[in-house]
């Protein structure tokens, strides 16, 4: 009877389901084993690599013996020294590559190789092992054949010597080298699966990519060669030019200016010791020039040899840009030196002007200014700064004959021109002046120099000043001198009132001159003075005496000039508004004949500050250093101020011309200003004019000066007698808003009249005084319904 074989029971569903997670965990376990193997292999390879690189022949090893107690130099210790000695003796220099190869093989064996170039079929561990062994044999033999150094082991070690000797004996030197190279390539393929066709393909791609790069380099080399040829040609041209220059006449060099300006008669008188010491108490005496600092001796500018060298450099630099020109003259000055250039026929001035920065770079200077037109000459000017800049003192200018011979009490000492001659200007001929420049360009110092030049020229009987100083720093130092019409204005609301007073004074003077029959202030003063000298003083035609009060007719007196200084009118326009611009424009249009003149200064030369209305009425301008050509065109309607040197270097545009003059401003210290101010304070008390800063400026005929400078009706005095007062009162009490602009808009009246109505309500207790934010509270109850 056949034995019945028991039937295998099928696995239960629960068991089979329990095995599925184990199968799923197999890749995770394999990854874990690979990571552990890599962690174990990496330190061994590092140890082997360190032992090889720190090998020392003095250490005991396989090929030599040493003392047991002697120190071991190898980082791997005695074991490392033995291993390194064995590997180096067996494999030679290939031993250093052995850890890297073993590491790469371990990585491939553990993680696989999924990159391009991997053989599609799995070669198996046997072939990989064969490839590794073949690589060791081939590399040792190759090194022994190519790098034999005479040692016993040689570069390829004992193994390399055996392989190379065996192959050389059978195949000769050529056959041995070819056999070793082929074996090396095949073993690399077997060990790594690398495809040499892929390697050749990649090398081909690199070669193709290298083509455009080589083409670019070749193009650059060609350009360099052409540049070198052009440079050699220029050198040849320069040599020819040098021969021509040796035969040409030297540049005409004007002598430098004298360091000391010739003193005037007044300066000589001030140096004499007076017989009677004392100070005038009526302010009629002018301050002595001894209050100012004397100029100090300073270094000279360029020498004649340096000027000649600079002339040649300018010509060579222009020739680099294919511009033929010849320097025909050099004019050294205290701050800059002007070179006069005569361009060749057909050369445009714009070609030279566009090279100002390149010329400055070529001459190693800060900036170069190109003067397109020099009156009376057919040359172009190049203004180059001196290495050592001369400081110009205000005392030099005020002691000069040019300043002393000027009969006008409004003489301004601006500075020195490029030749070192004093530059003075008459404010009465300008008749107004606009000064603009960036911060630190010397604008404030120039304004102080202008003020002092007026104070040293005219007494307070001949000249009065109104100073507006929004910054409260520059002009406030003059507080208390007899020349001021009012205290130095720092509140911009009072500044607008002061300008309205000037408009009212201008209109009053015009009426006086019309009644007397003269055309300007000088004629008026001459006629009044002649009448006084004849013993028949002229009576004031505008004064209406009141017989009931016993008033007698008032005789006319000479009128002083009035100069209005505004240090930063950009801030004033921002605070007060556009109405100040209209007041300034009205004064600039009509105030010349009345003897009222404006000097405006700003550090923000933008079109919203220096507007077309101001520029049209103030043609005389001074531009200090600015940051761009746009700012220069805003001030002067032409470029050039951006190339100035700062510290008082300016372009002065005189009246009646479009060609600015370069002037170097005078320096005046704070100590000098304080000494002059203290002297003027001691010479006479202040004589402020009443009502200069009042908000309402009447013109004597029942009208007042409006916000724009035009006359407006007083509206019955601006109190409760105004016919619109009741209507304005109703509007304010109904709306509960005491706003000047609201009353002005609802009643369609002027700003000044609306302001007077609000002030009348304040006086009557209807509204409160303005609070810190300008708002008023309506105190009166609303009208009954």
Swiss-Prot record:
Cellular-component GO terms for this entry: plasma membrane
Residue intervals of the FtsK domain: 420-633
Cytoplasmic topological intervals: 200-785
Entry binding sites for ATP: 440-445
Biased composition (Basic and acidic residues): 1-13
Keyword ATP-binding: yes
A molecular function GO annotation: DNA binding
GO terms under biological process: cell division; chromosome segregation
Location of the protein in the cell: Cell inner membrane
Superkingdom of the source species: Bacteria
Annotated segments matching region Disordered: 1-26
Entry annotated with the keyword ATP-binding: yes
Transmembrane segments: 36-56, 91-111, 123-143, 152-171, 179-199
The entry's keywords: ATP-binding, Cell cycle, Cell division, Cell inner membrane, Cell membrane, Chromosome partition, DNA-binding, Membrane, Nucleotide-binding, Transmembrane, Transmembrane helix
Mode of membrane association: Multi-pass membrane protein
Family stated for the protein in its record: Belongs to the FtsK/SpoIIIE/SftA family.
Function description: Essential cell division protein that coordinates cell division and chromosome segregation. The N-terminus is involved in assembly of the cell-division machinery. The C-terminus functions as a DNA motor that moves dsDNA in an ATP-dependent manner towards the dif recombination site, which is located within the replication terminus region. Translocation stops specifically at Xer-dif sites, where FtsK interacts with the Xer recombinase, allowing activation of chromosome unlinking by recombination. FtsK orienting polar sequences (KOPS) guide the direction of DNA translocation.
Entry's free-text remark on domains: Consists of an N-terminal domain, which is sufficient for the localization to the septal ring and is required for cell division, followed by a linker domain, and a C-terminal domain, which forms the translocation motor involved in chromosome segregation. The C-terminal domain can be further subdivided into alpha, beta and gamma subdomains. The alpha and beta subdomains multimerise to produce a hexameric ring, contain the nucleotide binding motif and form the DNA pump.
Quaternary organization: Homohexamer. Forms a ring that surrounds DNA.
Protein name: DNA translocase FtsK
Lineage of origin: Bacteria, Pseudomonadati, Pseudomonadota, Gammaproteobacteria, Lysobacterales
